[in-house]
Amino acid sequence: MSASTQGRRIVVVGAGVGGLAAAARLAHQGFDVQVFEKTQGPGGRCNRLQVDGFTWDLGPTIVLMPEVFEETFRAVGRRIEDYLTLLRCDPNYRVHFRDRSDVTFTSELCAMGRELERVEPGSYARYLAFLAQGRVQYRTSLDHLVGRNYAGLRDYLSPRVLARIFQVRAHRRMYADVSRFFQDERLRAAMTFQTMYLGVSPYASPAVYGLLPFTELGVGIWFPKGGLYAIPQALERLAREEGVRFHYGAPVERILTDGGRTRGVRLEGGEVVEADAVLCNADLPYAYEKLLDPKATTLKRKEKLRYTSSGYMLYLGMKRRYPELLHHNVVFGRDYKGSFDDIFEFRVPEDPSFYVNAPTRTDASLAPEGKDALYVLVPVPHQHPDLDWKVEGPKVRAKFFARMAELGFPSLESDIEVERRSSTPDDWAGTFNLARGSGFGLSQNFTQIGPFRPSNQDARVKNLFFVGASTQPGTGLPTVLISARLVTERLMTWAHAQGVSLSPRTAAATPLEGVAA
């Protein structure tokens, strides 16, 4: 070990969005950072498919809370505009109901008012009150709850924090809380389905997630030019500029521990890479089960952990464009509550709700001229012994096309030019090492948020840290970026306690030439 790197060597396991953002932040603070990733490129589940001129996002499809993305770049002395072009989606999305009615949601208040009054007379005034509550939930959560590390349960249960928890209505259930503002079941569904971004049911999730529809409608929905994969590309470029070294096609077989410390990692080929600390961006339950010696470390309540739902995905290259579709389209099944009950009781809904993404409405470069690259997400249960996705997958696919035919797209299946592949919970588990094929990581029910969620620092192995959707503060792209900030702060505290001497960069490095944004 050279004197220049003593105590500063960090190995990051995984090049997902959280690992990339944390690597850039740590390198900016003066750490010597290497990233090891099992696949051939960055992004994790925030990835893409490209075939014959069609481009599909593989996982996430929207950007919410742009201020969190801006802060990530600002923290290392950069401007997000030099790395990403964020395009606003407006109208935000259209929601289709089983009675063949629909509502187009927009951030433009007058237009939104007309849509709401058409469905439920008198609802616009209550909608404004709903947005006002959502703004309080949004700002309070970001500024006082989600955006900080907790020293422990006592810290979380302090009078100051408890007051904030009640202020954001985390003690209430989201569907019940939203029902105070809207009487029409269609609007109640349209204002609560956003919990599926987190893979949880609005009937079981805290009402604080009312911040999600506010974020969409009050702050806006955004889309990076080139698709969501532009985000990990930009973060990788940023990290490289800060001196981070990347090793792709390099699966980590084991995080090595000895005497209450980690000393690095062993790759599948047998090579040992020594480190002063390890930051794991692999899905946390998978890491504890597959990468760590259970005798050396512990994950409390592991057998009681609850997981989010998963998704059955279709990536369709179409022979033509469908002007009836917006960029974001949500289609509800007949029984809104029943579909959530089915998913979380490990049944595939008979009449599923689903989401259709048509990104050429915002970025025409994602498909050949006059054609559409459609992304379809059908929420389904995560892996379960009673579900065989070789059997269930084709059934879900057939239900999707049948429902689209009812909506006025009878030739959709015959219009397919390229069908790259479908993704099931089995694929999410196999490709991205997601425990149980759970597409969004650990659930964010009340018993798995705040300090009840697995910590970003192991309790026994003090130089082992975690970043990503299954650690604090939670799932979703902006939350994972906050996770990267929080674990950097936690790791900095650890390093200072060890007497590590750091020399943070005080000015932005010169951008690398020839590195794709």
From Swiss-Prot:
GO terms for biological process: carotenoid biosynthetic process. Keywords: Carotenoid biosynthesis, FAD, Flavoprotein, NAD, Oxidoreductase. Its cofactor is FAD. It catalyses: 15-cis-phytoene + 2 A = all-trans-zeta-carotene + 2 AH2. FAD binds at residues 11-44. Its EC number is 1.3.99.29. Gene3D superfamilies: FAD/NAD(P)-binding domain. InterPro entries: Amino_oxidase (IPR002937), Carotenoid/retinoid_OxRdtase (IPR014105), FAD/NAD-bd_sf (IPR036188), Phytoene_DH_bac_CS (IPR008150). GO terms for molecular function: oxidoreductase activity, acting on the CH-CH group of donors. Pathway: Carotenoid biosynthesis; lycopene biosynthesis. It is an enzyme of class 1 (oxidoreductase). Belongs to the carotenoid/retinoid oxidoreductase family. This is zeta-carotene-forming phytoene desaturase. It comes from Myxococcus xanthus. The lineage of its organism: Bacteria, Pseudomonadati, Myxococcota, Myxococcia, Myxococcales.
